[in-house]
UniProtKB/Swiss-Prot annotation:
PROSITE patterns: CYTB_CTER, CYTB_NTER. PANTHER family: CYTOCHROME B (PTHR19271:SF16). Binds 2 heme b groups non-covalently. Belongs to the cytochrome b family. It comes from Aplodontia rufa (Mountain beaver). Heme b b562 binds at H83, H182. Component of the ubiquinol-cytochrome c reductase complex (complex III or cytochrome b-c1 complex) that is part of the mitochondrial respiratory chain. The b-c1 complex mediates electron transfer from ubiquinol to cytochrome c. Contributes to the generation of a proton gradient across the mitochondrial membrane that is then used for ATP synthesis. The lineage of its organism: Eukaryota, Metazoa, Chordata, Craniata, Vertebrata. It is a multi-pass membrane protein. A ubiquinone binds at H201. InterPro entries: Cyt_b/b6_C, Cyt_b/b6_C_sf, Cyt_b/b6_N, Cytb/b6-like_sf, Cytochrome_b, Cytochrome_b_C_euk/bac, Cytochrome_b_N_euk/bac, Di-haem_cyt_TM. This is Cytochrome b. GO terms for molecular function: metal ion binding; ubiquinol-cytochrome-c reductase activity.
């Protein structure tokens, strides 16, 4: 008799995705981040659901409702810190996942890559709106500054900002709509993740060598289920150490002060995972130019398949491009550091240089080096 997992309509889908899925035999730990991101999303949805049961999206009570969750709700402090630090963990996994895709040429699976970019943008939007909800000082001023960037759009900018605010400043209407969107977006992300997987399983996984692996596939279970479980255990260990020992290390102390429209914090900055983009935004003196650079710093990922000049898919056997890739990684860390610094010398100059280098590396240096490597290999 045929196994039920191969005949039952629902089990069949799970079977083809997680059990009998033909997987390259040589994929490394860098391929663990997909499952870790799925885990992060589930943790965020579950903790978020419990937080939403006690949270009130009103400007007068939002801050105190978060304090109430931490003080009076059973394990409320744990749920709140798991949700806040879960977002940081989500972005660590997300950036490593994208970096892996860039390194091993996964962007040549166009549909999977483009859905992935949509996922990245959706997660960024969700995280930004979630940061506004506790209604602390940085929540309020962060929301004011970032939404105000839309006013740089010619002709419709000012009207667009007021339409998003629901008034003439960030207020009750803004908070309520941000809560509504923050609640619904993770479910859209879940649907997009399923489409991401659907397209991935159409073409099959890439592998570190970048070569076709049809002749050497193994079933996903037990080989990669056990590998993913190991990744999950290590991630959970790191996560719980972060949540239980230093839950506020990645947050901003200003957010423990209730929002006050009359007092501007000395340094307005977003959460750490947006600092690289914020540094690129600040490095251009012109408002519209800064906004365009900010948007393009993420959307540049769409161009990667067009900028792939090498005859090899992966960077595994391309040492010169590898060097540039790691310079890019260091550059992004530099931008993250600069984004958290005040706007003064020498940080302005460092930020401008790092921003120029970021675009130069992706748009010119890496493609040209790829061509040069092909020439060196007499291809």
């Amino acid at each position: 008799m045929t196994n039920i997992r191969k005949t039952h309509p629902l089990m069949k889908i799970i079977n083809h995705s997680f059990i009998d899925l033909p997987t390259p035999s040589n994929i490394s730990a860098w391929w663990n981040f997909g499952s870790l991101l799925g885990f992060c999303l589930i943790v965020q949805i579950m903790t978020g659901l419990f937080l939403a049961m006690h949270y009130t999206s009103d400007t007068t009570t939002a801050f105190s409702s978060v304090a109430h969750i931490c003080r009076d709700v059973n394990y409320g402090w744990l749920i709140r810190y798991m949700h806040a630090n879960g977002a940081s963990l989500f972005f660590i996994c997300l950036y490593l996942h994208v970096g892996r895709g860039m390194y091993y040429g996964s962007y040549l699976s166009y549909e999977t890559w483009n859905i992935g970019i949509l996922l990245l943008l959706a997660v960024m939007a969700t995280a930004f709106m979630g940061y506004v909800l506790p209604w602390g000082q940085m929540s309020f001023w962060g929301a004011t500054v970032i939404t105000n960037l839309l006013s740089a759009i010619p002709y419709i900018g000012a009207s667009l900002v007021e339409w998003i605010w629901g008034g003439f400043s960030v207020d009750k209407a803004t908070l309520t709509r941000f809560f509504a969107f923050h609640f619904v977006l993770p479910f859209i992300i879940m649907a997009l993740a399923m489409i991401h997987l659907l397209f991935l399983h159409e073409s099959g996984s890439n592998n570190p060598s970048g070569l076709m692996s049809d002749s050497d596939k193994v079933p996903f279970h037990p080989y990669y289920t056990i590998k993913d479980i190991l990744g999950l255990i290590l991630l959970t260990l790191f996560f719980m150490i972060l949540v239980l020992f230093s839950p506020d290390i990645l947050g901003d102390p200003d957010n423990y002060t209730p929002a006050n429209p009359l007092i501007t914090p000395p340094h307005i900055k977003p959460e750490w995972y947006f600092l690289f983009a914020y540094a690129i935004l600040r490095s251009i003196p012109n408002k519209l130019g800064g906004v365009l650079a900010l948007v393009f710093s993420i959307l540049i990922l769409v161009l990667l398949p067009l900028l792939h000049m090498s005859k090899q898919r992966s960077m595994a056997f391309r040492p010169l491009t590898q060097c540039l890739f790691w310079i890019l990684a260091a550059d992004l860390l530099t931008l993250t550091w600069i984004g958290g610094q005040p706007v003064e010398y020498p940080f302005i100059a460092i930020g401008q240089l790092a921003s120029i280098l970021y675009f130069l590396l992706i748009l010119f240096m890496m493609p040209l080096t790829s061509l040069m490597e092909d020439k060196l290999l007499k291809w």
